[in-house]
């Protein structure tokens, strides 16, 4: 079968930094497909390869990577792409076309309209399979997401639509389900009888000024909270699915999201130097902190504290699950530290379980000790990157790592109050935790796990 990935946004950051390396690695694993990259930055394939692909890339990859100058605003663009695809398809009797939209959401509508025109003009005397891949954020808000989905479903069936949140391709997300449901020692304590609180921390050291034109329209809510954070919460709190099939997992995730009320108590800020060279005042939030509850039977009353944003002192992504201290102090009234599970996503994937053990040469004095799993130490450095797993699933037609439209819709509903344009946005100095994040901890009598 002839399989072609038509890469919209083929000269953008996502394609250059994530998708092309993923394509190369999959080709090295003997997955067979062609890539047609579309872009406006270069006029020829030679210029594209010289400026976009590492010179050390093997010919086993570059021989299967083509390029077409493509301006979506050009009325002749569709004809050019149709002609190119006809040339690539040739006389093949089985063809799969994968349209990968690495574009801003505002361009989805035009892209889908053009894809429909291309499909109609192909005249392929063959068995044709179609897929379309759309990146997060899917839409700008609930209304636009629903509108884009209506447009998508006029051209593709739900089976053919792959909505990407690359965090679902990360090993830690899949490990989270395995850890919870394949280990009785964890499974039996993972509910509101024993868990006191959960923290989710996503701090980044870099800013957004180099891609301000894009980020100014997106902000921290659309960039991280509506997608990555909501998906993590579903994996942390979903009930055990009947199986690990995409349908059964999605059913339990949707139940979690439906139980969460819209976030009405939150704080947002922007770092002080944001847009300083842009010539205008930029009020786009780059940091947010809030509390929410999952109102299901097993997780009701467990507060989930979230903070996420840019220009922090240290880059870290982690989940901190704190357990209730129900231990009676029988050991000479020594203070007992709460048990915890700490899942670190960045800078490296580790899972720590914190327990209290006796210190040597003491009279029953205890000390918290961590038992650690380290992904790279245990399984080596061959763990696939998230996008490699995502693309592989697309190629084989497995939708287990892709959020459903119901999940996306519920996630937009939850964060919708945070998208209002009249928000108070506090300015915070770079490399410092915003005051409102510290205040959230103070008001709720907890300490951020730093």
Residue map of PLM features:
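Secretory/organelle targeting and membrane-embedding segments
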Residues: 1-134, 138-450
């Amino acid at each position: 079968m002839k399989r072609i990935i038509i890469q919209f946004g083929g000269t953008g950051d996502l394609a250059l930094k994530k998708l092309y390396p993923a394509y190369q690695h999959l080709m090295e694993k003997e997955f067979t497909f062609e890539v047609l990259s579309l872009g406006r930055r270069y006029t020829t394939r030679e210029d594209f390869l010289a400026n976009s692909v590492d010179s050390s890339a093997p010919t086993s990859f570059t021989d299967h990577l083509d390029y077409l100058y493509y301006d979506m605003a050009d009325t002749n663009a569709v004809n050019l792409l149709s002609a190119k695809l006809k040339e690539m398809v040739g006389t093949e009797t089985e063809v799969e076309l994968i349209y990968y939209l690495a574009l801003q959401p505002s361009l989805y509508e035009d892209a889908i309209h053009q894809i429909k025109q291309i499909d109609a003009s192909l005249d392929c005397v063959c068995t044709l399979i179609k897929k379309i891949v759309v990146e997060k954020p899917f839409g700008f808000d609930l209304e636009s997401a629903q509108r884009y989905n209506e447009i998508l479903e006029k051209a593709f069936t739900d089976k053919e639509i792959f909505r990407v949140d690359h965090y679902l391709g990360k090993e830690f997300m899949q490990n989270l389900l395995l850890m919870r449901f394949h280990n009785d020692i964890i499974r039996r304590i993972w509910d509101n009888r024993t868990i006191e609180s959960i923290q989710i921390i996503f701090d980044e050291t870099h800013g957004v000024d180099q891609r301000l034109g894009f980020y100014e329209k997106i902000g921290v809510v659309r960039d991280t909270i509506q997608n990555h954070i909501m998906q993590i919460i579903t994996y942390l709190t979903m009930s055990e699915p009947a199986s690990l099939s995409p349908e059964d997992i999605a059913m339990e995730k949707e139940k979690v999201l439906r139980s969460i009320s819209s976030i009405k108590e939150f704080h947002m800020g922007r770092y002080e130097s944001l847009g300083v060279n842009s010539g205008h005042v930029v009020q786009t939030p780059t940091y947010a902190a809030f509390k929410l509850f999952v109102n299901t039977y097993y997780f009701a009353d467990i507060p989930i504290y979230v903070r996420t944003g840019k220009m922090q002192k240290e880059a870290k992504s982690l989940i901190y699950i704190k357990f209730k201290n129900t231990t009676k102090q029988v050991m000479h009234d020594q203070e007992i530290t709460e048990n915890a599970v700490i899942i670190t996503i960045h800078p490296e994937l580790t899972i720590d379980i914190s327990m209290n053990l006796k210190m040597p040469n003491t009279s029953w004095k205890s000390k918290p000790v961590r038992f650690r799993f380290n992904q790279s130490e245990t399984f080596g450095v061959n763990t696939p990157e998230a996008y490699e797993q995502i693309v592989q699933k697309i190629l084989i037609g497995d939708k287990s790592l892709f959020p459903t439209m119901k999940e996306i819709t519920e996630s937009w509903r939850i964060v919708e109050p945070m998208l209002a344009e009249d928000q108070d946005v506090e300015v915070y100095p770079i490399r410092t935790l915003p005051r409102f994040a510290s205040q959230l901890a103070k008001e709720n009598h907890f300490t951020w796990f730093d």
